[in-house]
């Protein structure tokens, strides 16, 4: 599976709203993201895991 890049658009409590390169937005629990994630952070999704770019 090829890595996918997401950008954190906003954080609402325990959820982050992230968008991929095409602009498609989804929300995900903060517990699944690396610590220190903030609005504007770029994330890489690879092997069923998020990491900071």
Residues covered by each model-derived region:
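Glycine-centered tight beta-turn/hairpin loop motif at sheet-sheet or coil-to-beta transitions
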Residues: 1, 21-23
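Short aromatic-glycine-enriched beta-strand elements
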Residues: 14-17
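Beta-strand/loop nucleic-acid-binding surfaces
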Residues: 24-35
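Short, Lys/Arg- and Gly-enriched loop/turn segments at beta-strand edges
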Residues: 48-53
């Amino acid at each position: 599976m090829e890595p996918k890049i997401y950008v954190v658009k906003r954080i609402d409590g325990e959820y982050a709203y992230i968008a991929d390169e095409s602009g498609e937005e989804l929300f995900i629990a903060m517990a699944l993201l690396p610590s220190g994630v903030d609005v504007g952070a770029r994330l890489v999704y690879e092997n069923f895991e998020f990491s900071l770019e």
